Amino acid sequence: MKISRSLSTVEVHTGGEAFRIVTSGLPRLPGDTIVRRRAWLKEHADEIRRALMFEPRGHADMYGGYLTEPVSPNADFGVIFVHNEGYSDHCGHGVIALSTAAVELGWVQRTVPETRVGIDAPCGFIEAFVQWDGEHAGPVRFVNVPSFIWQRDVAVDTPSFGTVTGDIAYGGAFYFYVDGAPFDLPVRESAVERLIRFGAEVKAAANAKYPVEHPEIPEINHIYGTIIANAPRDPRSTQANCCVFADREVDRSPTGSGTGGRVAQLYQRGLLAAGDTLVNESIVGTVFKGRVLRETTVGGMPAVIPEVEGSAHICGFANWIVDERDPLTYGFLVR
């Protein structure tokens, strides 16, 4: 058989959310920043994303990242995040997955009891620390990018749920944060269809009404998803949240960048003190922890540096081929 492309991946999940790491088979990516490399991929090789994220190799809620060379002196590697709709600016669960794989598979020099991993992402440089006992990787904590409330108490009108009020905050991506209780939206698997409809309608309305732009990275200029918070199932958790992002994807994890934005939102509203920990529960009951490390500014705006902690596990290795004779080789989505 004639194979037009072969791609190798490491399959990881973070709190239940898939993350497919592409380790080989990509074309050489031109550009001296991750954002420019991402732009080249989007224009010249987007079929790779479709092949790996869409069915039959992936599914409507698939997520992944392409390894690339670092662009800053303190980074071990760079990453370009991909999903069903396109490309994202940040992915906290992806950072945790990448850091776990880097330590488990020896991509970085490992030290006990903790190993540092530096990652260049579209949103900037991210530093992670992985617990390492000499045999196994444990929980990962990463220093998030500066995070902040962009706009408070904004309202959007939706077709199915009426007026929805919340905050737009940034934790590596812009999200619309809303309380699900007034809309009878528990963060449970049984409510996932209503959560998807709600999140998609709010995201569309917010993007139409409230233009956003990162003060220092103008390429980050859209609301990536809706984060719906409600009561957790575990009394030890602070809250549960469900992130509906991209093209109606549902995050199985508590959302890493979303946790960073939530920490900033709560801190800047006086609802989370320095030294306090947000225990953030996902739709499947897994947990990330978030806390404020320090205050900072971004383009003159008050912001904080959050730390986010979670765990990931390698669940497989794969080799994928692209066969141009296959009419579905670049994938499809039923939903």
Swiss-Prot record:
It is an enzyme of class 5 (isomerase). The active site is at C91 (proton acceptor). Substrate binds at G92, H93, D251, G256, S257. Its EC number is 5.1.1.-. Keywords: Isomerase. It comes from the Bacteria. InterPro entries: Hydroxyproline_Metab_Enz, Pro_racemase_fam. The lineage of its organism: Bacteria, Pseudomonadati, Pseudomonadota, Betaproteobacteria, Burkholderiales. One of its GO terms (molecular function) is 4-hydroxyproline epimerase activity. It catalyses: trans-3-hydroxy-L-proline = cis-3-hydroxy-D-proline; trans-4-hydroxy-L-proline = cis-4-hydroxy-D-proline. This is 3-hydroxyproline 2-epimerase. Belongs to the proline racemase family. Pfam families: Pro_racemase. NCBIfam families: TransHydProDhtase. Catalyzes the epimerization of trans-3-hydroxy-L-proline (t3LHyp) to cis-3-hydroxy-D-proline (c3DHyp) in vitro. Can also catalyze the epimerization of trans-4-hydroxy-L-proline (t3LHyp) to cis-4-hydroxy-D-proline (c4DHyp), albeit with 3.6-fold lower efficiency. Displays no proline racemase activity.
